[in-house]
Design a protein with these regions (language model features):
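Structural signal for interior beta-strand "rungs" in well-ordered beta-sheet cores
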Residues: 5-8, 12-13, 17-247, 252-253
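C-terminal end-helix/capping segment
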Residues: 250-262
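Phosphate-binding loop/pocket of nucleotide- and phosphate-handling active sites
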Residues: 265-268
Length: 268
């Protein structure tokens, strides 16, 4: 197949394929037209890479991964890694499908996306981010640099999570949510002690259009209402009503969100 390329006989490679040195392509891989692959890339068995994708250097595309048209993966990323769980982990143990990346997605350098997770179209995942297994992302989701998204999390379309935020397991972020840098979400009031914790493990729910300021902390199981505004550094211990600004430690309501800041006004 060419200098620097080792490809299994069962792999299918489209026209215009360009590659660097040391590329390994596994059994039953399918690569579309116009795909470019850097040096020292591994594409494991059963992965599908659609037309016009670009893969950087030292990338691993794990078995069963599906990359739709025009996906870009930067250097040193790992796409679709299977988890190896600790004995004490609360995450499910099951066979996972390959990761799915919708058309036009972009994945940053040194980012790890786990198997069983699905991204819609035009999502952006920044450098050094990590997204665990069984997560679901809508279209146009932005996950910033060094963000962690733990397992079994759902993120709605157009939601933005900025650098360094921590999204714990079992969280739901609806559409058009804004999460500022260094926000922390939690899901375990027992902090790892006693078997009782397994019955109460629950992440927060952030409803459509809510905004969470930098460094805020959201405690387990709380609900942030639609279009609510959480001030910088707030510690949210209780549910927050829709269209309400809360501040402080613990966070308390201070006033309604101004009408001109609501999504309907901004979109109108």
């Amino acid at each position: 197949m060419g200098h620097g390329l080792h490809s299994a006989d069962s792999a299918t490679i489209g026209g215009g394929f360009a590659h660097g040195l040391g590329v390994a392509i596994g059994e039953d891989v399918k690569i579309g037209d116009g795909v470019t692959v850097g040096s020292f890339v591994v594409i494991e068995a059963g992965a599908h890479i659609a037309d016009g994708c670009s893969i950087g250097n030292h990338v691993t595309i794990c078995s069963g991964a599906r990359l739709a048209d025009g996906v870009h993966v930067a250097d040193f990323a790992v796409i679709g890694r299977r988890p190896r769980l600790a004995a004490s982990s609360t995450a499910k143990r099951e066979e996972l499908a390959g990761v799915r990346l919708g058309a036009g997605c972009s994945v940053g350098s040194h980012t790890v996306l786990m198997a069983g997770t699905t991204f819609g179209e035009r999502c952006i995942v920044g450098d050094n981010a990590g997204v665990r297994e069984r997560c679901t992302m809508g279209d146009g989701v932005v996950i910033g640099r060094s963000v962690t998204v733990e397992n079994d999390t759902t993120i709605g379309s157009r939601t933005k999570i900025q650098s360094g935020a921590y999204i714990t397991a079992y969280v739901t972020l609806e559409e058009d949510v804004f999460i500022a840098p260094m926000v922390v979400t939690t899901n375990d009031n027992f902090m790892g002690r006693t078997q009782e914790r397994f019955k109460h493990l629950r992440g927060c729910t952030v409803r459509r259009g809510a905004r969470v300021g930098g460094g805020a902390h959201l405690l387990p199981g709380i609900e942030i209402g639609a279009e609510a505004f959480i001030a910088t550094g707030a510690v949210v211990t209780k549910d927050v009503p829709a269209n309400t600004i809360v501040m402080g430690v613990p966070a308390k309501p201070v006033r309604p969100v101004p009408a001109e800041e609501l999504l309907e006004s901004a979109e109108g």
